[in-house]
Curated annotation (Swiss-Prot):
InterPro entries for this protein: ACP, ACP-like_sf, PP-bd_ACP
Domain annotation Carrier: ranges: 4-79
Pathway where it operates: Lipid metabolism; fatty acid biosynthesis
Changes after translation: 4'-phosphopantetheine is transferred from CoA to a specific serine of apo-ACP by AcpS. This modification is essential for activity because fatty acids are bound in thioester linkage to the sulfhydryl of the prosthetic group.
Organism of origin: Petrotoga mobilis (strain DSM 10674 / SJ95)
Name this polypeptide is given: Acyl carrier protein
GO MF assignments: acyl binding; acyl carrier activity
Top-level taxon of origin: Bacteria
Entry similarity comment: Belongs to the acyl carrier protein (ACP) family.
Family matches, as Gene3D superfamilies: ACP-like (1.10.1200.10)
Length: 85
């Protein structure tokens, strides 16, 4: 999986979980400011990421996820996806 493919999968999960338009989900979109996610939705999103990708996201890591790009970067790190394809 490439980072672009990861972003597309993350986008799909965000659209399904937060019921937002796909166009709204950009790398620099803030979960709370741009996508209007509340704390419960962020927990749901985290659980969806963990389930889909088979990873564990710690509370300290969750606190650092403010944008879609933060989530993609964290997941790519956990999945050992390199930028160089």
């Amino acid at each position: 999986m490439t980072k672009d493919e990861l972003f597309e999968k993350v986008k799909e999960i965000i659209v399904d979980t937060l019921s937002v338009d796909e166009d709204e989900v950009t790398l620099d979109a803030s979960f709370t400011d741009d996508l209007d996610a509340d704390s419960l939705e962020l927990v749901d999103l985290t659980m969806a990421f963990e389930s889909e990708f088979g990873v564990t996201i710690e509370d300290e890591e969750l606190e650092k996820i403010k944008t879609v790009e933060n989530a993609v970067n964290l997941l790519s790190e956990k999945l050992n996806i390199d930028d160089e394809d």
